[in-house]
Curated annotation (Swiss-Prot):
Disulfide bonds join 130-133. Pfam families: CMD (PF02627). HAMAP family: AhpD. It comes from the Bacteria. Its EC number is 1.11.1.28. This is Alkyl hydroperoxide reductase AhpD. The lineage of its organism: Bacteria, Bacillati, Actinomycetota, Actinomycetes, Mycobacteriales. It comes from Nocardia farcinica (strain IFM 10152). Homotrimer. Antioxidant protein with alkyl hydroperoxidase activity. Required for the reduction of the AhpC active site cysteine residues and for the regeneration of the AhpC enzyme activity.
């Protein structure tokens, strides 16, 4: 199992992450598509090739092809949107009257349940640190009737995967440097 491979690759100092990853992979708060889509989108957002490969391998066995692509699509489109809207927010409203002019059709037609896509976008926005997008996706999820518990669990998944990605990158960098 690839989650097992990922857990086994974590060093002793990341024991909490190993335990959290075990726990979150068995979440009953999220349905299977929500969980594995959030895991996959979050892994893509970490920019850790190993984390993405290991989670993607298992996600491919669980998710439909449409959900797999939509989760990666959420990570990709949020990679653009989070930079744009976070940057725009730093400018203190001086550009709020200008149109974004960015193509974002996947958000309107993700190929899966829109609430699931929003959940994955919410998770990625938390990893990428965009308060504007995080709040917008949370609002859309609440309007769609998604419970606070489901939204919060998605945030937990994102946090754990982000921490795992950081630990994996540190471990790989130190191994490459023979430290």
């Amino acid at each position: 199992m690839s989650i097992e491979n990922l857990k086994n690759s974590l060093p002793e100092y990341a024991k909490d992450l190993k335990l959290n990853l075990s726990s979150i992979a068995r979440s009953t708060v999220l349905n299977e598509q929500q969980l594995w889509g959030t895991l996959l989108a979050s892994a893509a957002a970490t920019r850790s090739a190993t984390t993405l490969r290991e989670i993607a391998e298992e996600a491919a066995d669980v998710l439909s092809a449409e959900a797999y692509n939509a989760a990666l699509g959420a990570a990709s489109i949020m990679g653009m949107n989070n930079v744009f809207y976070r940057g725009k927010a730093f400018l203190g409203g001086r550009y709020d009257d200008l149109r974004a002019g960015l193509r974002m059709q996947i958000i309107g037609n993700p190929g899966v349940d829109k609430a699931d896509f929003e959940l994955w976008s919410f998770a990625v926005s938390s990893i990428n640190g965009c308060a504007h997008c995080l709040e917008a996706h949370e609002h859309t999820l609440r309007e769609a009737g998604v419970s606070r518990e489901v939204i919060f669990e998605s945030l937990r998944v994102a946090a754990i995967v982000a921490g795992v990605g950081q630990a994996v990158q540190s471990t790989e960098a130190l191994a490459a440097a023979a430290v």
